[in-house]
Amino acid sequence: MSIYNPKSMKAEEFINDVEIRETIAYAQANKNNVELIDSLLEKARPVKNGSGVTCAGLSHREAAVLLACEIPEKVEEMYKLANEIKLAFYGNRIVMFAPLYLSNYCVNGCVYCPYHMKNKHIARIKLTQEQVRAEVIALQDMGHKRLAIEAGEDPVNNPIEYILDCIRTIYSVHHKNGDIRRVNVNIAATTVENYRKLKEAGIGTYILFQETYNKKSYLELH
């Protein structure tokens, strides 16, 4: 049996099924534990010091307790504290990004996704670099400065080289109201070497959604 280790490079250790189940059980057992919830809210509170603002943060188990809480007044306290933390670190602003879908070719069979390989009811499209450029100009005209590029998992149609070419194209567009400042990337999990290539290309954030951490459900859905 794998042992939970959040710093491990092995997926089965940092995404550990036993730890996830135990965390959920712990949260359910403590979701109405007022004393514990109060202590967690206090722990999460931002603190001002000489160098700015710091926050102790919460462990995943502690965060799970707050997420499971069903006490209305404590939930309201969480909303207020969340806003306090947000203002302390980010100020009174909201950062938005626009999705840019590059390709819906995909070799996976995820049952919840319209891109899945058995779906014969959609046309498969892969943008050329000129089409990418046109999309970027259209998004800039709307006022967007940050994008999140999206692509299905297909090593033939959507190799990392294609993704990198698209990133370079996006950053190269200098339109009347400026250019794109940040390209976030939402593609399938890849190799360490490819992550390095993405970093060298100047991406902002790499996004990887895990629709479920329930092992049984994951196998059924994928």
Task: Give the location of each predicted region.
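Core AdoMet radical
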Residues: 117-222
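Generic detector of short, locally flexible boundary/turn motifs and exposed helical patches
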Residues: 15-18, 60-64, 75, 112-114, ...
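A broad, structure-centric signal for solvent-exposed, well-ordered loop/edge residues
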Residues: 65, 73, 103, 107-109, ...
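Solvent-exposed, flexible loop/coil residues
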Residues: 62, 98, 104-106, 217, ...
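Flexible, acidic/Gly-rich N-terminal and inter-domain linker regions that tether
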Residues: 1-100
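Canonical Radical SAM [4Fe-4S] cluster-binding loop centered on the CxxxCxxC motif
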Residues: 91, 95-131
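Conserved, mostly hydrophobic/aromatic
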Residues: 55, 82, 110, 149, ...
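Surface-exposed beta-strand edges and their flanking turn/coil or helix-capping segments
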Residues: 73, 80-81, 109-111, 162, ...
